[in-house]
Amino acid sequence: MVWQGPQRRLLGSLNGTSPATPHFELAANQTGPRCLEVSIPNGLFLSLGLVSVVENVLVVAAIAKNRNLHSPMYYFIGCLAVSDLLVSVTNVLETAVMLLVEAGALAAQAAVVQQLDDIIDVLICGSMVSSLCFLGAIAVDRYLSIFYALRYHSIVTLPRAWRAISAIWVASVLSSTLFIAYYNHTAVLLCLVSFFVAMLVLMAVLYVHMLARARQHARGIARLRKRQHSVHQGFGLKGAATLTILLGIFFLCWGPFFLHLSLMVLCPQHPICGCVFQNFNLFLTLIICNSIIDPFIYAFRSQELRKTLQEVVLCSW
C-alpha cells in the first residue's frame, strides 16, 4: 500500500522484509516510547475479506434479480455493495499475492511486483473513494425522500440517479489514479483527509436533521393520540440510538485510516506517530469490517431485499 510510504507490502514481501507471524505486542522504538502494536493474522484478514465479498455479492445479485428493487435508492445501495466488494477483493488479492511471494510459490521481478502493487493500490483507493461517495449519496437520497416526499420521484429520477452514479465512478477512478501517482505530495493526503471529513459532516448534518424531523412528526402523532410523553421519549431514544450506531460505525471503521493519513502529514518522524503507523493493517481490517457491516445497515433492513436474498441463496444451492 502506498499509504505506508516506503514500506510497500508487496515489495516488502519480495525483498523478504515482511513482518513476522502477526500477533499482539508492545514494540519499542529505538528513540521513542513502547508502542502497542496490534498485528492482524493473515488468515483472519483473508477470512473477513471473503465474508465481505460473499455478503456484497449477494446484495448485488438480489438487487439485480428483483425488478421491484430497480429504483434509485436501491441502485445507490447496490453501488455501495460493489464498492465494498472491490475494497475487500483488492485487499484480499494483495494479501494473497504477498503470501505467495513470501512462500516462493510466485516468482516475479521487482518491476512486475511494482506495477501490480500500483494497480492494486489504484483499485483500493478508487473503491474507498466510491464507497464514501455512495454513503453520502444514500444519505442525500434519504434526506430528499423525507423533506421533499411529494416531489421526490420527480427530483430523484432514474436518469439523474444513473448520471450521479456514473459521475461518482468516473471521479473515483480519476482521483485514485492521481492520488497514487502523486502520493508523496502532502496535498494529496490532505485532499483525502478533507474528503473524509466532508463526508462525515455531510452525513451527520443530514441524519441529525432527519432525526429532528422524525421526532417532530412523532410529537404531532402523539398529540393526536394524547400519549405525547411516552411515544416521544421512546421514539427519541430509538432514533438517537440508530443515528449513533450509523455514524459511530462509520467513524470507528474509517476514522483510524484517515488519522493515519493525517499523521503522515503532521508528524511523519515523531515516535508517537510512528506507533500509530505500525497499526496500518489494523486500520485496513476495520475498513473490511465496515464492508461487512454496511449490508446490515443499508440493505438487509429491507424486507423485499431480504426475501429476494433468500431466493438467491436457495437457487444457488
Curated annotation (Swiss-Prot):
Membrane topology annotation: Multi-pass membrane protein
Covalent lipid adducts (S-palmitoyl cysteine), residues: 315
GO CC terms: cytoplasm; plasma membrane
InterPro entries: GPCR_Rhodpsn (IPR000276), GPCR_Rhodpsn_7TM (IPR017452), Melcrt_ACTH_rcpt (IPR001671), MSH_rcpt (IPR000761)
Glycosylated residues, chain numbering: 15, 29
Subcellular location: Cell membrane
Extracellular compartment residues: 1-37, 94-118, 184-191, 267-279
Record flagged with keyword Lipid biosynthesis: no
SMART domains with a match to the protein in the record: 7TM_GPCR_Srsx
Name of protein: Melanocyte-stimulating hormone receptor
Organism per entry: Canis lupus familiaris (Dog)
Underlying gene: MC1R
